[in-house]
């Protein structure tokens, strides 16, 4: 009977330890994506200036020219991807 109590206590202590380790690693992992996303989407000043000078995808191109890689749709007056089937 003593062995059963000791094994139950050790099992319970092991589960508590496993929970604590998992919780600690999960809290560290939550910070990692935030740091990674902020570094990915960090924009330098040159890119911001280029962004203001041209219109991006599905933006009006009446007054602004489309950014590189896009063409102005003659029908809708939006910047779209160039494709052979477009008029």
From Swiss-Prot:
Q: Does the keyword Disulfide bond apply?
A: yes
Protein origin, superkingdom: Eukaryota
Q: Where in the cell is it found?
A: Secreted
Task: Please name the SUPFAM superfamilies in this protein's record.
Answer: omega toxin-like (SSF57059)
Q: Which GO terms describe its cellular component?
A: extracellular region
Task: State the family named in the UniProt similarity comment for this chain.
Answer: Belongs to the neurotoxin 10 (Hwtx-1) family. 51 (Hntx-8) subfamily. Hntx-8 sub-subfamily.
Decide whether keyword Ribonucleoprotein is in the record.
no
Q: What does this protein do?
A: Ion channel inhibitor.
Domain statement: The presence of a 'disulfide through disulfide knot' structurally defines this protein as a knottin.
Q: Name one GO molecular function term.
A: ion channel inhibitor activity
Q: Which cysteines are joined by disulfide bonds?
A: 54-67, 61-72, 66-79
Q: Which residues form the signal peptide?
A: 1-24
Its protein name is U3-theraphotoxin-Hhn1a 2
Which ranges of residues are annotated as propeptide in this record?
25-52
* Tissues expressed in: Expressed by the venom gland.
Keyword line: Disulfide bond, Ion channel impairing toxin, Knottin, Secreted, Signal, Toxin
Native source species = Cyriopagopus hainanus (Chinese bird spider)
């Amino acid at each position: 009977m003593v062995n059963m109590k000791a094994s139950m206590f050790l099992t319970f202590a092991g589960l508590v330890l496993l929970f604590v380790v998992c919780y600690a690693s999960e809290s560290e992992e939550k910070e990692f994506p935030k740091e990674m996303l902020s570094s990915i989407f960090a924009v330098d000043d040159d890119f911001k200036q280029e962004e203001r000078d041209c219109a991006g995808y599905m933006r009006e191109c009446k007054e602004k020219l489309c950014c590189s890689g896009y063409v102005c749709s003659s029908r809708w007056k939006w910047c779209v991807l160039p494709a052979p089937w477009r008029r």
